[in-house]
């Protein structure tokens, strides 16, 4: 129900974030419940899923435009590692969990410390310990690592065929650059580096595939740390989607969801 509601312009200009997602998702869920239906939350970003399932309180983490812009400028001038070192100095737990290239999350953690004089890692741990307000079944669809990596490589090849290079070139022509937090996303920063003459296209594609595989590995690590996840190893079902769906429906019925 939320697909297509957020335009690329909003994302690129950093006007969409987890708090807005939580607000929109909860409103959509209420709309679905009102129709007598069961919401299905689908996605791959663990923190966004957790924001809903644990109903995380973000009131202490409201964004402060002036300080955020100051941090973005520091990242642009001195690099991601400089910003990450700032985080390491005040919140080593978060620094250990957040990659230096994930500038958006580094900035969010620094903002939180700036506003509350306490680390966001402590706040997040407190929120994680909350019991979910929902009767839910948390499924994680999983495939063998070698197949996952092949699919990632194939998907990136397809993205290039569908115009990733042209899309990033258009954004560059509009004034977007690697110093912007939104342009640190996978696909953007690697292609921008190529367009800036830092390395050949073949190297940009190699780095993009490598970093996407690393990202997928971190996602799997996140889900393994989550409580009450139900892992659906697709090879155990011979990749038969009907069998997988039947098992998921059985779990939902057993839990009184259906």
Predicted regions and their residues:
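Catalytic core of IPPT-family isopentenyl/dimethylallyl transferases
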Residues: 131-258
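Single conserved hydrophobic/aromatic residue that forms the stacking wall/gate
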Residues: 1-7, 12
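Conserved catalytic core of sirtuin-type NAD+-dependent deacylases
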Residues: 19-22, 59, 65-73, 165, ...
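Structured helix-beta-strand junction loops
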Residues: 28, 35, 77-78, 89-90, ...
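Gly/Ser/Thr-rich beta-alpha loop segments that engage phosphate groups in nucleotides
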Residues: 6, 45-48, 57, 119, ...
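Long, charge-dense, solvent-exposed interaction surfaces that engage phosphate-rich ligands
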Residues: 46, 52-158, 174
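Phosphate-binding/switch loop-helix module in NTP-utilizing enzymes
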Residues: 13-47
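Residue-level signal for inorganic ion chemistry
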Residues: 7, 44, 109, 163, ...
């Amino acid at each position: 129900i939320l697909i297509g509601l957020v335009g690329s312009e909003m994302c690129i200009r950093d006007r969409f974030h987890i708090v807005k997602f939580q607000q929109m998702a909860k409103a959509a869920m209420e709309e679905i419940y009102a129709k007598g239906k069961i919401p299905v939350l689908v996605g791959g970003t663990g923190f966004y899923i957790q924001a809903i399932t644990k109903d995380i309180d973000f009131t202490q983490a409201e964004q402060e435009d002036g300080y955020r812009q100051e941090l973005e400028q520091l990242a642009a001038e001195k690099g991601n590692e400089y910003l990450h070192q700032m985080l390491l100095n005040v919140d080593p737990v978060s620094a250990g969990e957040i990659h230096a290239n994930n500038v958006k999350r580094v900035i969010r953690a620094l903002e939180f410390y700036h506003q509350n004089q306490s680390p966001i890692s402590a706040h997040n741990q407190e929120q994680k310990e909350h019991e979910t307000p929902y009767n839910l079944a948390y499924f994680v669809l999983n495939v063998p690592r070698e197949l996952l990596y092949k699919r990632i490589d194939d998907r990136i090849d397809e993205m290039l065929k569908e115009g990733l290079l042209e899309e990033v070139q258009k954004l560059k022509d509009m004034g977007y650059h690697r110093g912007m937090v939104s342009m640190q996303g996978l696909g953007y920063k690697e292609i921008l580096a190529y367009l800036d003459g830092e390395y050949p296209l073949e190297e940009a594609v190699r780095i993009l595939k490598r970093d996407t595989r690393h990202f997928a590995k971190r996602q799997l690590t996140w889900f393994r740390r989550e409580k009450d996840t139900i892992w659906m190893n697709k090879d155990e079902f011979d990749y038969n989607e009907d069998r997988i769906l039947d098992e998921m429906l059985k779990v939902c019925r057993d839990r009184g969801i259906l």
